[in-house]
Amino acid sequence: VTDQHLADQPTSSGTRPGRALEYVAPAQLAPDLRSIDARDRPSRNDSLTAQLSTVVGGPVGDHALIGRVRFWTPLRVLFAFTVIFLALGWSTKAACIQQTDDGAGGLTLDWTNGRQYVAMCYSDTVPLYGAERLNEGAFPYKKYWIESTPDGGTEVRHMEYPVLSGLYQYAAMQVGNVWDHLPLPGALSVVVYFNVVALGLAVGWLITVWASSRLAGRRVWDAALIAVSPLVIVHAFTNFDALATAFAATGLLAWARRKPVLAGVLLGLGGAAKLYPLLLLGPIIVLCLRADPMRRQPAARAGLRLRDIDSLDAVRTYLRETPARTHLFALRPLGAATLAVLAAAGTWVVVNLPIAALYPQGWREFFRLNTTRHADPDSIYNVIASFTGWQGFDGPLAHGEPPTILNTVSLLLFLLACLGIGYLALTAPRRPRLTQLCFLVIAAFLLTNKVWSPQYSLWLVPLAVLALPHRRILLAWMTIDALVWVPRMFYYLGEDNKGVPEQWFTGTVVLRDLAVLGLCAMIVYQILRPEHDLVRRDFVDDPAGGVLNRAPDPLLPWLPEFLRPRLSRADAFARRRTPDRKVDRESV
């Protein structure tokens, strides 16, 4: 069946009194009606993949029946790749959970002579087990302890992670305790805890790959770079960020499937694990602002209005109509964005409110620590200081004293970057794709923030693959970013222990930042020249756009002139050819 026809359904008497319709096709056709030879075949259209495919027999044949394999579907192949690279990632951390004799007949972790740095196996999970008092079985945020400060004083400490990440650590500790009490092979409690955490993080990354493969649309094989990224080997188990990437990817997938409330819930959960999934709401709002026609919804379609409620029956009617009203509201771009934002905010509050109410001091610890934290070793501010001897915006500070000027500068730079991205989104000749703006926002956050922990680079991996599916370029950036781990570990080892000077480490940080800026530049270029966007070939608009996908791109007369979309090169050429006739942007 190549077309879909509608036919009148006759009654039993043979008449056709109404317009009851049925589909002649077995089901409603998919929106993608391209022929089978238009499928994504990387071994044929990507030189890097073609060269790598020689290991398994070479590129796919000209007469191969693509998409007919029963078991080894693209998704299962991606899962196999992911499991292999996650196993490699676990093996890189395995050296840090080796046990040795403690001299008293017991066992202890073998971190002697800086093993965690020499073997480059360091993971925050291992020291946090004791530092966050998880080894005592205490509930996070309720438990507190006293620590000595460098100036000779003391301070009260609590769990330093957002609520969902802290609860995940607590749940992993409880699972580890259950394992220890079962007749199963045993180990140090911290070793069992690390493996439980790693298992959950592996599931989170598998979910990230699954959701990203669905977001990729016809280019499902782009998600293979997420599965086989060098950053997975180095940082999948460095911290708990795979949880946040799973929520972020599934939130974007829910948005792509036109479920804004579910998208907001998932992004809100991600924000309760790490901050960055909430930042993805910004591009959604800006793109919906550009796409919304700003016309009032007819009252007849909206159902009963609040001002018409004058009885209990009217209240019941209004409540019955609420789901339909919400669905109708979500059909508008700004309506869908509003639902997503409200759902995200509500979810974040629901997750955080119980902890904030019961243990306010413990709940505030994450925000207190990030306020008083100084520039991270591989932030741009520390890079400048390492090469110039600069003392920073605030100069020397006492322990616990917040770097107020640094915090302000970092925030202002990020806001300025977001304003620039918003201007680009509104004035681009064609509405940008959602993942393009999402990558730009997260990259701007990392580049301007005072903290860029090494595992934060995992945030960029799915977004980069979906925004810029150029495999060689992405693989080069991922390799550079992963290799920053080597000088970092030997810098932490210290020069007295045959480590490297700080500038060796910060020099590689400069290369990483330049690589990320290069990706940003390429994405901006493709936003301004959408004809060069590989995703938008074969009449594809925005696979992750949801209500934005194939939506009209109006001229937005209600916006100031400097914020309206600019003419594309094709529009400008058409206007030069027909100077006396108005050019319709949507028909060019």
Feature annotation, model-predicted:
Residues T2-A211, A216:
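TM-lumen/periplasm interface segments of multi-pass membrane proteins
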Residues E22-G57, G61, I66, P469-V588:
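C-terminal multi-pass transmembrane helix bundles with aromatic-rich, positive-inside signatures
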Residues V209-S229, L262, R431-P432:
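Transmembrane-helix signature of polytopic, membrane-embedded enzymes
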Residues L231-H235, G251-L252, V261-L287, L440-L447:
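Membrane-interface alpha helices of multi-pass inner-membrane proteins
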Residues A244-P260, P293:
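Specific aromatic-rich, kink-prone transmembrane helix
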Residues L280-A345:
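Perimembrane helix-loop-helix junctions
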Residues Y318, R332-F414:
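Membrane-lumen/periplasm interface segments of specific transmembrane helices
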Residues D378-L447, I527-V588:
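Aromatic/glycine/proline-enriched transmembrane-helix motif characteristic
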